[in-house]
């Protein structure tokens, strides 16, 4: 099997004042054959941090498992909460260490720091690390990014950010044959003195 047939997807991320929204569609396809219509590409890693990925599905699952294990190990050894920035830098280092046999994936890391500051990072398969306010990855990214650029503002509410993320993924689904079959969302937000992560699934 050629790798080019297993790497399609669309995922987006948006950060705002006290929140991060991650969203991705659910289709896994190989060439013209749809393997699954219910695949999860958005992962809640902790109550304050999540991933959205696009690429070869086995690699998406592997990355989420590796990161969960590394975070748990850090928590046990130090007894402290690892920051979102540190997680992003750790994952970038892990991805770069596999540069000769890379994970066929693009990754969004989003979450809230202990003080409520929202963070969103974008990574390519080799671990190049960019912090941004919004991003789109995967085969549908050229379509989704236009929707994000047109609709994003720094002072938008979390509800408006959810609507924008859904609109961006939906637009990609309509034009990208490798994306489809619904949308999974993860919303991480600050509520008073706590951070809350909410997962949602939308049928299209």
Swiss-Prot record:
Give me the segments passing through the membrane: none
Q: What is its EC number?
A: 3.4.25.1
> GO molecular-function annotation terms?
threonine-type endopeptidase activity
Tell me, what controls this protein's activity? Answer: The formation of the proteasomal ATPase PAN-20S proteasome complex, via the docking of the C-termini of PAN into the intersubunit pockets in the alpha-rings, triggers opening of the gate for substrate entry. Interconversion between the open-gate and close-gate conformations leads to a dynamic regulation of the 20S proteasome proteolysis activity.
GO biological process terms, alphabetically, are: proteasomal protein catabolic process
Gene Ontology CC terms, in alphabetical order = cytoplasm; proteasome core complex, beta-subunit complex
| Chemical reaction(s) catalysed | Cleavage of peptide bonds with very broad specificity
Keywords (A to Z) from UniProt? Autocatalytic cleavage, Cytoplasm, Hydrolase, Protease, Proteasome, Threonine protease, Zymogen
Annotated catalytic residues = 10
InterPro entries given in the database record: Ntn_hydrolases_N, Pept_T1A_Psome_bsu_arc, Pept_T1A_subB, Proteasome_bsu_CS, Proteasome_sua/b, Proteasome_suB-type
Q: What does this protein do?
A: Component of the proteasome core, a large protease complex with broad specificity involved in protein degradation.
Q: Which family does it belong to?
A: Belongs to the peptidase T1B family.
Quote the subunit structure annotation: The 20S proteasome core is composed of 14 alpha and 14 beta subunits that assemble into four stacked heptameric rings, resulting in a barrel-shaped structure. The two inner rings, each composed of seven catalytic beta subunits, are sandwiched by two outer rings, each composed of seven alpha subunits. The catalytic chamber with the active sites is on the inside of the barrel. Has a gated structure, the ends of the cylinder being occluded by the N-termini of the alpha-subunits. Is capped at one or both ends by the proteasome regulatory ATPase, PAN.
Entry protein name = Proteasome subunit beta 1
The organism is Hyperthermus butylicus (strain DSM 5456 / JCM 9403 / PLM1-5)
